[in-house]
Each structure stands twice: as C-alpha cells, then as structure tokens.
Amino acid sequence: MTTIGTPLRPNATKVMMLGSGELGKEVVIELQRLGVEVIAVDRYENAPAQQVAHRAYTISMLDGAALRALAEKEKPDFIVPEVEAIATATLVELEQEGYNVVPTAKATQLTMNREGIRRLAAEELGLKTSPYRFVDNLEDFKQAVAEIGIPCVVKPIMSSSGHGQSVIKSEDQIQQAWDYSQEGGRAGGGRVIVEGFIKFDYEITQLTVRHVNGTSFLAPIGHRQEDGDYRESWQPQAMSDLALKRAQETAERITTALGGRGIFGVELFVCGDEIIFNEVSPRPHDTGMVTMASQELSQFALHARAILGLPISEIYQISPAASKAIVVEGKSNNMTFGNLDKVLEEIGTNIRLFGKGEVNGHRRLGVILARDENTEKALAKAERAYAKLAVQL
C-alpha cells in the first residue's frame, strides 16, 4: 500500500529536485497536489521550480560534496534529477547507500552525456542510429568530419536546448562549429559527438512512462526545432501503424535498459516506416509541454504518479493540441508580458509564463498552448496567439 505523509511534518514524503527549470516547476506543482514536500535545487537563485517549492537551495550540482551534504541534511525519500549537469558519481554512491534516485542513478549517469547513451543504444542494444564519432580535440574533430561527411551535426556530449550544437554544411564552417561546441557544453569545453545528418521525414518524441503497473506510451509528439532547440510541438503526430509500433518498441527497449520508474522522452527520427534512435531523457521533455493541453494527465502528472508508485491505468487524450515556445532575444532582468487579453481571446488557448528572472541572449520564457479539432488548427491557433504577445525587455 502506497502512503503519503503530511508536508512540513516529521512523516512528510519528501522529494528533492535537482534542477529547477520550467519542467521541474510543473513536476513540483503536481507533487504538491499529491501532498508531497518538495525541495528544489539549482545553480542560481529563484529558478522557476524554486519559486513554488517548500524550500530551495542554490549550489553547484556538479559539486559532489555539496550535493551529498544537501541529501544528508534533507534525507529525501526521492531524489529527482531534472538536468544533465549533476555529479552523477555522487548519485550512484547515494543510491548504493539507500537513497531512491529517479529513475535510477545509472539512467542519470548514462544520459547526462551523449556518449553513454549512444553507446548503450547503438553498441549494446543494436538500435539504429546515425553514424557517429566522439572526439576530444580539433585535429580529431576534423578527421571525424571527413569520415562522417558533410553535412553533419556537432554537439557537446553534455548540453541541452541546442547549446553548442550546430550543423556543418560546408568545409569553411568546421572551425566555427568546433569553437561553438567548446562554448556550449554544460561542463565547459571538451568532448563532442559528430553525427551523420539524417534526412528524415519528421521527428517525434515518444514519451514513455515506466510505472508500478508496467510501461505505457503517450501518443507520439511531433515537433519543430531551430538550432537544436524546440520551438513548436503537437500531439498526436500522424504516423503509420508500423512506424508507431516500431517507435514504441524502440522506446521500450531503451527505457527498460535504463530501468526505474518515471517518464522518459525518447527522441526518434522517422523515415517512412523506419525508426532511427536519436536521444533519450529520463525526465519530462520540453516538447511534452503540449500534454498540459492535450491530455487529462500531463507528462508532469504522470511523472509524479510514477515516482510515488501510484497506478497509471489509462492515458487519456482530451484533444489534439499544440505548443509554441515563447523565445525572447535580448538582455533584461525586468521583462513584461503584454497584450495577454488578446493572446487568450480564442477558446482553447492558454499560456504558461515560467517566471525566469532574466534573459541574456536567447531564452525560453514561456509557452503558448492551444487545442482544436486537429493538430494543424491547434498549431495555427497557437501561432496566432503568439503573434499577439508583446514582450518588453
């Protein structure tokens, strides 16, 4: 029998979130709806999830000693990583000592860098991927580009939201791509992956939730990216029965290998009926924000249930829906979001503003959500709402 205590009391069920971005914020809210006490941790103060948690701490999560000290102080029932830049060796130690790391310390360690998960997928599980090379210096990088061929994709082995990622389309871009990769890694410069460019029909996120009753699949999510970062997503993505079956099989194989309970964002390329594995995140996925409009239980609510060992009997889709990221460019720590009466005037339209305190360059500050009778109309509705938004820096 699963039980939950009372927040801020000795019997509280406690979750410590490592990373407090907009995805973590929604997980915190869902956990609190279930009576869980939440501690939010990030490298900067007043991160989105910290704003809604019971307590917040600001540390470098790459500092294993600081991470251990915090775990020993709070003694959480669950440690839930939300970002890649974490001292995963410390998480492995804590798990061995009896702490419950979600989904597992192994999953967090393997997926924190692209090398671990690519070698698991391609070399151990035999999943189809793009051709790839891992390199540590400019000389080997140039050789890898020559072997893989142009065009090719370059990514730091540890980064997110497109940071440090680029596509080499001509030889004169090789040096620039290397330099950019060294600036964009979560842990600084260093090792990168060079991948062959896949000519796919479309790409999907196959959200997969491992829970006390087994493994369940959400309807596939289509999405569009710019510079490696999500801009729009929609659910469901139309695909053939065979392609969907293969996508779910691929997702089940990789998530089973990672183990544990929780939601996984499995990124796949689709070429006709063929499925090519790209990446997996052992946590909610940015493209999955659309589920806040499309499903009875969003990816965040499903993650919370899975973490706590609560049953997930059915994943019910309310409506086709779409999301559009609110990406702002500039420099400010005092943003204003205006014209909201116009943004929300159409039925089935909603907005989430993340509460981020500043922007310096490009930053995702919110998301538009829209429902309609099909995904094309939902996306058009989201785009109309987005066009009406006035952001003042």
Curated annotation (Swiss-Prot):
Keywords: ATP-binding, Ligase, Magnesium, Metal-binding, Nucleotide-binding, Purine biosynthesis
Keyword Magnesium: yes
Gene3D superfamilies per record: 3.40.50.20, ATP-grasp fold, A domain, ATP-grasp fold, B domain
Alphabetized GO MF terms: ATP binding; magnesium ion binding; phosphoribosylglycinamide formyltransferase 2 activity; phosphoribosylglycinamide formyltransferase activity
Binding residues for ATP: 114, 155, 160-165, 195-198, 203
Annotated ranges, domain ATP-grasp: 119-308
Binding annotation for N(1)-(5-phospho-beta-D-ribosyl)glycinamide: 22-23, 82, 286, 356, 363-364
Any Pfam family matching the protein: ATP-grasp
Transmembrane residue ranges: none
Entries under InterPro entries matching the protein: ATP-grasp, ATP-grasp_carboxylate-amine, ATP_grasp_subdomain_1, PreATP-grasp_dom_sf, PurT, PurT/PurK_preATP-grasp, PurT_C
Record-listed E.C. numbers: 6.3.1.21
Reaction equations catalysed: N(1)-(5-phospho-beta-D-ribosyl)glycinamide + formate + ATP = N(2)-formyl-N(1)-(5-phospho-beta-D-ribosyl)glycinamide + ADP + phosphate + H(+)
GO BP term, pick one: 'de novo' IMP biosynthetic process
Coiled coil: none
SUPFAM superfamilies xref list: Glutathione synthetase ATP-binding domain-like, PreATP-grasp domain
Recorded metabolic or biological pathway in which this protein acts: Purine metabolism; IMP biosynthesis via de novo pathway; N(2)-formyl-N(1)-(5-phospho-D-ribosyl)glycinamide from N(1)-(5-phospho-D-ribosyl)glycinamide (formate route): step 1/1
Protein origin, superkingdom: Bacteria
Record has Ligase as a keyword: yes
Residues that coordinate or bind Mg(2+): 267, 279
PANTHER family, per database record: FORMATE-DEPENDENT PHOSPHORIBOSYLGLYCINAMIDE FORMYLTRANSFERASE
Oligomeric form and interacting partners: Homodimer.
HAMAP family referenced in this protein's UniProt entry, alphabetically: PurT
Function (record text): Involved in the de novo purine biosynthesis. Catalyzes the transfer of formate to 5-phospho-ribosyl-glycinamide (GAR), producing 5-phospho-ribosyl-N-formylglycinamide (FGAR). Formate is provided by PurU via hydrolysis of 10-formyl-tetrahydrofolate.
Name of the protein in its database record: Formate-dependent phosphoribosylglycinamide formyltransferase
Organism: Actinobacillus pleuropneumoniae serotype 3 (strain JL03)
